[in-house]
Design a protein with these regions (language model features):
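Short, solvent-exposed coil/turn segments at beta-strand boundaries
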Residues: 35, 39, 54-56, 99-101, ...
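Secretory pathway targeting signatures of secreted, lumenal, and periplasmic proteins
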Residues: 30-76, 109, 113
Length: 154
């Protein structure tokens, strides 16, 4: 009976740490909507930057100059941004497509915390956004859900 109780308590603790409720949030300057952790605080919402923060996540979005840029430039761009920030243990760059975006990401370690660095390019207008998500105590799948939820408001 003690083992069962201990197992249930351990499972509940694990689920509370790994489960993350996500809700839509919008960067108003660009009408860029994505799923973010419920209750996360918006630190900055300007035309240059959108910053979100809570105990588990630090999410930063920036609009980049995309003149003459193509989707083939995205892997080199995200790698360069990660190198500039001295991200360690970088994975290979992975590509993904969303309904309105071409995207790339890589994972690594920013100082001591795991992170994802990503770039999204709109398929129609060619706008480019840089996203960094630094996190702790959550699974990579939660971060990937966030990255795969981006869309432009119609």
């Amino acid at each position: 009976m003690k083992r069962l109780f201990l197992f249930v308590v351990t499972a509940c603790l694990y689920l509370s740490v790994s489960a993350q409720n996500l809700v839509p949030i919008t960067w108003t300057a660009f009408g860029l909507t994505f799923d973010a952790p419920k209750g996360i605080l918006v630190e900055e919402d300007t035309e240059d930057t959108f910053l979100l923060n809570n105990a588990r996540f630090y999410i930063s979005l920036q609009s980049l100059d995309s003149e003459d840029m193509t989707k083939d430039d995205l892997p080199k761009l995200v790698k360069g941004l990660a190198d500039d920030d001295e991200v360690q243990q970088q994975t290979e760059v992975k590509t993904f497509d969303l309904e309105q975006f071409h995207g790339v990401w890589l994972k690594g370690i920013a100082e001591v915390d795991p992170c994802y660095y990503a770039c999204l390019m709109t398929k129609d207008a060619g706008s480019v956004y840089y996203i960094s998500i630094i996190y702790n105590r959550v699974e990579d799948k939660v971060v990937e859900r966030i990255l795969k939820s981006f869309k432009m408001e119609e």
